Amino acid sequence: MARFLVALALFGVVAMTAATGDAPKEWSGKPWLGKFVAEVTDKSENWEAFVDALGLPEQFGRAPVKTIQKIYKQGDHYHHIFALPDKNFEKDIEFTLGQEVEIKQGEHIAKTKYSEDGEKLVADVSIPTKGKTIRSEYEVQGDQLIKTYKTGDIVAKKWFKKVANPTEAPAQAA
């Protein structure tokens, strides 16, 4: 169960999901808002060392998979939708900048706090029962989103290509 939580945190998906009402979805205003895709062949750096440092089982993150990150604002909240289409997985994370969100999975509680550092979106995840912390930074350079992951002294990166600023958020998974 703890490995599952670490895997979720690794992909930036540890948070609560909640209804947001009828506020319009905003896809612009921050450089990190939009839809970004990492294909199987896209660039990554130091990924296996990072996965090893988290103690994840083989099925999490070793083989390259298509990954989609969608981040938009709705009212006072943001949504970070993380999807692995080949694994039929999608998670919608609702967050407010600067506020910690907790999620309980079995006996474990993971805490996530999103904030801004200049033009970057930062997600700090703590899983106290595993003694793990993960920092993810989302930085846009041109038409690319560079996601930098850090745990302990291990740093890894993945590059995503900007696809678009959609006009509608996708339907939420149950």
Curated annotation (Swiss-Prot):
Region (SAHS-c1): 26-57
Signal sequence coordinates: 1-19
Gene disruption phenotype: Results in a significant decrease in survival after desiccation but does not affect survival under frozen conditions.
Stated family: Belongs to the Secretory-abundant heat soluble protein (SAHS) family.
GO cellular component: a single term: extracellular region
Primary role: Secreted heat soluble protein acting as a molecular shield in water-deficient condition. Tardigrade-specific intrinsically disordered proteins (TDPs) are essential for desiccation tolerance by forming non-crystalline amorphous solids upon desiccation, and this vitrified state mirrors their protective capabilities.
Main location: secreted
Keyword Chaperone: no
Organism in which the protein naturally occurs: Hypsibius exemplaris (Freshwater tardigrade)
Statement: the UniProt record of this protein carries the keyword Signal: yes
Ranges where the record places region SAHS-c2: 72-100
Annotated protein name in UniProt: Secretory-abundant heat soluble protein 68234
Top-level lineage group: Eukaryota
Gene: SAHS 68234
One Gene Ontology MF term: lipid binding
